[in-house]
Structure formats: C-alpha cells, structure tokens
C-alpha cells in the first residue's frame, strides 16, 4: 500500500512501479509478520509465527528447524546464495544456502569484545571486512549513523557506493 502503483498519493516509487508493471504485482500480499526476523523465519520454514516462535531478534537462540526453503531449493539442484543480512544464530548458520555473503552488523552482541571470536562481527560480516578494506580500518557502519531498528540518523560519511544497500545490490548482481 506504500507504492505508487498501488495508488499512494505521496509515495513515489518509479523503479518498483516499473518492476510491478512488467512482472507480477500482488496487491493483496502481506508479510506473516512485519518484523524482519520473524518474517524471515516464516519465509524460510513455511511456519506461522505461532509455530516458529520468533517475535524478534534474541541473542544466542539457534535456528533449529527441520525443514527450510533454501535447503529444499539446494537439494532440488538450485544454486543458492544469501546476500545481505540474516540475523540468525549461530552467525554463520547457512539455513540451507550453499554460499553466504553477509552483512549482519548492527547487533550489539556480535560487536561485544567478549563474544566468542567465531561469533564476533569482524569474523562473519563480509560487508564490514569489505568496508574496512575500502575506506580504512577505522570505518564502521554503526558509527556512521546506521543502527538496527533505530530512528536515529546521520549523514553517511563515506562515498555512496560504500553504503550497505549499494554493496548488497552489487554483491547480488555479482552472484547472478
């Protein structure tokens, strides 16, 4: 309902409108849950929130589901890759994806210096490693004004192509 093609009077979404006009548009679609992690669990497992028991992010709660869509696709011969954020535990749990290029930043637990090394963001966050190589070791997303589920904002201090959204798009195109 927040798309130009849906008739919203103020929101301008020309690129999404173009994709919808040229492809398939689902005007009655809805998310099983409007929060990213429970919605991801619903998409991956086919279970409702009542049955997958995710209400949001919780540190250290494993994703222990017997069946997940990425695994079924991989088993069916599809080449699967996850690009972007997963926010699952443990951090490098594949959920059935064959390859993962992650940006799982923002969450305090994984930035805690006392977290086990394999769970620390510097170990598993592909984007953070890339950003530090591109913009210098001191480059940091959280200090740049981006925080998980926050309304706080600051101007992005790096070049536009270094932004997590552009990195995710570039990595997705590289995969395709």
Question: What are these regions, as identified by a protein language model?
Answer:
Residues 1-176:
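Formylglycine-dependent sulfatase
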């Amino acid at each position: 309902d927040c798309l130009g093609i849906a008739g919203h009077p103020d929101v301008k979404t020309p690129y999404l409108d173009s994709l919808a006009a040229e492809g398939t548009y689902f005007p009655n679609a809805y998310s099983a849950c409007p929060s990213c992690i429970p919605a991801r669990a619903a998409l991956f497992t086919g279970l409702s929130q009542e049955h997958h028991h995710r209400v949001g992010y919780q540190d250290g709660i494993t994703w222990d589901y017997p069946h997940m869509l990425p695994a079924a696709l991989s088993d069916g011969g599809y080449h699967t890759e996850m690009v972007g954020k997963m926010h699952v535990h443990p951090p490098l749990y594949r959920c059935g994806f064959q390859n993962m290029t992650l940006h799982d930043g923002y969450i305090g637990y994984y930035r805690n210096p006392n977290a086990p090394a394999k769970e620390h963001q510097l170990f598993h966050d592909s984007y953070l490693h890339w950003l530090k190589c591109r913009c210098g070791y001191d480059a940091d997303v959280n200090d740049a004004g981006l925080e998980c589920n926050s309304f706080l904002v600051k101007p992005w201090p790096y070049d536009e192509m270094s932004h997590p959204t552009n990195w995710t798009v570039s990595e997705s195109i590289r995969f395709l």
